[in-house]
Each structure stands twice: as structure tokens, then as C-alpha cells.
């Protein structure tokens, strides 16, 4: 399993695929599958049966996962996509933006 540089809560932009250019917050990262769920991106229709929680049932829009390689982190300082580096500060590893050299 490789070390992923994108975490839940990061703001990312889709750089490839049908939703290219869309931005959103990472809701969940699946490390074993190299996929992530991004808020408002890659919406799919799920058909749900009536239940106690949803007595009506019907069709519900829900986010599906997207490949990690198709998203890039947005630098909070420059608001552009950036690559992520890891360096040691003191005795902790921290992520930093390669464009602005700012700790994320």
C-alpha cells in the first residue's frame, strides 16, 4: 500500500475525467483502493426501497468514489493545484505545498 498525500477534509480539484475542473472537499479516502469520495463530484443515482428511515423510497443522488490520481490538492495560499511534499519539522512529519512551500 502506498503513502497517500491526500487526506479527508482537504479541498481538491478534479484534473481528469468527466468532472474535470470540479472542486470539492474530500469526505473519505479508501487507501486500499486508491480512491476518494469528493463532495459534489461523481454523483450517481441509487434506487432505494422504502424503509423506516425513508418511507417514500425512490431515487437518491449520492457521491461515488474517484481515483486519487484524478484529483489534485488546492494550495490554500495561491488557490491553484499543487503537488504535496512531506518533510520533518522537529520530530513530526508535515505535509507542505510544493508551489508555496506552506505547511498544509
UniProtKB/Swiss-Prot annotation:
Keyword S-adenosyl-L-methionine: no
CDD domains linked: KOW_RPL26
Superkingdom of the source species: Bacteria
Keywords: Ribonucleoprotein, Ribosomal protein, RNA-binding, rRNA-binding
Transmembrane domains' residue ranges: none
Cystine connections: none
Pfam family for this entry, one: ribosomal_L24
InterPro entries from the UniProt entry: KOW, Rib_uL2_dom2, Ribosomal_uL24, Ribosomal_uL24_CS, Ribosomal_uL24_KOW, Translation_prot_SH3-like_sf
GO process terms (BP): translation
A GO cellular component entry from the record: ribosome
GO molecular function term, any single one: structural constituent of ribosome
Family matches, as NCBIfam families: rplX_bact
Record's function text: One of two assembly initiator proteins, it binds directly to the 5'-end of the 23S rRNA, where it nucleates assembly of the 50S subunit.
PANTHER family referenced in this protein's UniProt entry, alphabetically: MITOCHONDRIAL RIBOSOMAL PROTEIN L24 (PTHR12903)
Subunit structure: Part of the 50S ribosomal subunit.
Family per record: Belongs to the universal ribosomal protein uL24 family.
Entry protein name: Large ribosomal subunit protein uL24
Recorded name of the encoding gene: rplX
